[in-house]
Curated annotation (Swiss-Prot):
Protein name: Carboxy-S-adenosyl-L-methionine synthase
GO biological process: tRNA wobble uridine modification
Species of provenance: Escherichia coli O127:H6 (strain E2348/69 / EPEC)
GO molecular function, one term: carboxyl- or carbamoyltransferase activity
Reactions catalysed: prephenate + S-adenosyl-L-methionine = carboxy-S-adenosyl-L-methionine + 3-phenylpyruvate + H2O
Family in the record: Belongs to the class I-like SAM-binding methyltransferase superfamily. Cx-SAM synthase family.
The encoding gene: cmoA
């Protein structure tokens, strides 16, 4: 059962940097619904994309799977034989709960739930890869290498779904969408103290890029087609396709 997120409702003397620990994992479903506009839509649409792109005898990778929401959405929409989903996260608390969530919903498609670093995972025979609010937690200098690896491991015609919090090259637009996101969190019951303390913990850990920067990296990796398919305020998702005639 999900618990309500009250982690930052009282003043914290020494905030430190953000970690996906046991306390965060316990309230994560409530936290992400109240913090990320459009999250449920993105999760459900990832399933629809899986129905279109997952091919028989291939693998799907959920890189930074947290509690397995995207994995479950993909699995519900796979209608082929001999497919497998590989879900990876480096948080022991998240992985423990993810395994429980996956085991609670029976389906023919097997899921390997792995506690590990997504930078160390081999991507092979993939028809779809999901990076759902994950890349932003990697050091910027390490992001290109991961996208290069994903491109190499995707089969021709395969898809990468890349969801992120965005920064904006237009400062005026960035300020507006930043403020609207905070309005969204206030409307969902977060206090000014909660918003401020969480932001302070995340600012050195979650480093955002512009859509233009993401597209430039994807193009450099070899992807020929990438476009923003969902956006709400400063959160959104790109769908990126490997050409069907790619070597």
């Amino acid at each position: 059962m999900s618990h309500r997120d009250t982690l930052f409702s009282a003043p914290i003397a020494r905030l430190g940097d953000w970690t996906f620990d046991e306390r965060v994992a316990e309230v994560f479903p409530d936290m992400i619904q109240r913090s990320v506009p459009g999250y449920s839509n993105i999760i459900s649409m990832i399933g629809m994309l899986a129905e279109r792109f997952v091919q028989p005898g291939t693998q799907v990778y959920d890189l930074g799977c947290s509690l397995g929401a995207a994995t479950l959405s993909v699995r519900r929409n796979i209608h082929h034989d001999n497919c497998k989903i590989i879900a990876i996260d480096n948080s022991p608390a998240m992985i423990e709960r993810c395994r429980r969530h996956i085991d609670a919903y029976k389906a023919p498609t097997p899921v390997d739930v792995i506690e590990g670093d997504i930078r160390d995972i081999a991507i092979e025979n993939a028809s779809m890869v999901v990076l759902n609010f994950t890349l932003q937690f990697l050091e910027p200098s390490e992001r290109q290498a991961l996208l290069d690896k994903i491109y190499q491991g995707l089969n021709p015609g395969g898809a990468l779904v890349l969801s992120e919090k965005f920064s904006f090259e237009d400062a005026k637009v960035g300020e507006l969408l930043f403020n609207m996101h905070h309005d969204f969190k206030r409307a969902n019951g977060y206090s000014e103290l909660e918003i401020s303390q969480k932001r302070s913990m995340l600012e050195n850990v979650m480093l955002t890029d512009s859509v233009e920067t993401h597209k430039a990296r994807l193009h450099k990796a070899g992807f020929e087609h990438s476009e923003l398919w969902f956006q709400c305020f400063n959160f959104g998702s790109l769908v990126t396709l490997k050409a069907e005639d790619a070597a």
